[in-house]
From Swiss-Prot:
Residues spanning the membrane: none
Pathway: Metabolic intermediate metabolism; pimeloyl-CoA biosynthesis; pimeloyl-CoA from pimelate: step 1/1
Protein name (record): 6-carboxyhexanoate--CoA ligase
The protein's required cofactors: Mg(2+)
GO molecular function: 6-carboxyhexanoate-CoA ligase activity; ATP binding; magnesium ion binding
Family (UniProt): Belongs to the BioW family.
Sorted UniProt keywords: ATP-binding, Biotin biosynthesis, Ligase, Magnesium, Nucleotide-binding
Pfam families reported in the protein's UniProt record: BioW
GO annotation terms (biological process): biotin biosynthetic process
Organism (species): Aquifex aeolicus (strain VF5)
Highest taxon of the lineage: Bacteria
Length: 240
């Protein structure tokens, strides 16, 4: 079976605004490209890349999903830190991750295109390029239509469909835990994840209207090169 990776990234005024990937059969290419073309709300630059997949691994999804709501971002962030400590992340390291996303992870101000890689022991940022970060690519659901229908029926959103796949690949590649909330000013739900705590949706992790957001991957320094290689090179299809 021939599979193709379809990746889209879009920018506006030089800033990353949208990105997504689908891994599909040849006969599904046109549909996938059209879907990704319509994904960004606004942009002045878009790049769509189609690549034939050489090797891939099918992995069974095994994360539990939970949802928690709070009265304020402060309460929600405290809970996020608590859940991360349950995954073995030191409290001060988890708090540092929250602070980085709340202030804007890009050292020059604003958001990063990719994720922060944070040392689980020291809280030090390990990504080589601290403006771009590291992006998780080359992953999708084996049967995206089936997964989407199931999750929507259970009350989840399309965002959750994509986020679950992304964070599952992260954990598969050796990321110990993840903290994420969107840079979309209108979307205030985020999550933490780990093999023990599962995928934990938390709202609101920021105030409505706040344009800052991003991802922090908590990683072991000694496994850094292997993790980055897996995140950026290995093709993973996830089976629900």
């Amino acid at each position: 079976m021939d599979l193709f990776s379809v990746r889209m990234r879009a920018q506006k005024n030089g800033k990353h605004v949208s990105g997504a990937e689908r891994i599909v059969k040849k006969e599904e290419l046109e549909t996938a490209v059209k879907e990704l073309l319509n994904r960004p709300k606004e942009f002045d630059f878009m790049n769509v890349k189609v690549e034939k997949v050489k090797d891939f691994e099918v992995v069974k999804f095994n994360l539990k999903i939970s949802t928690y709501s709070f009265k304020s971002p402060e309460e929600a962030r405290e809970f996020a830190v608590k859940k991360l400590t349950q995954e073995g992340i030191k409290e001060e390291v988890a708090k540092k991750a929250v602070e980085i996303l709340s202030k804007g992870a890009n050292p020059k101000g604003g958001n990063m295109r990719g994720a922060v890689l944070m040392d689980i022991e020291t809280g030090e940022r390990l990504e080589e390029d601290k403006e771009r970060g590291v992006r998780t690519i080359h992953f999708d659901w084996k049967d995206r239509k089936k997964v989407t229908e199931k999750l929507l029926k259970e009350g989840y959103t399309l965002r959750t469909v994509d986020a679950l796949a992304l964070t599952f690949k992260n954990l598969f590649c050796g990321v110990v835990a993840e903290l994420c909330w969107s840079d979309d000013p209108d979307y205030v739900t985020g999550y933490v994840s780990g093999k023990e705590i599962g995928y934990v949706r938390i709202t609101p992790l920021k105030e409505k209207g706040d344009p800052l957001g991003g991802r922090v991957y908590f990683v072991s320094r000694k496994e850094l090169s292997e993790i980055i290689e897996c995140l950026t090179q290995k093709v993973v299809l996830i089976e629900l």
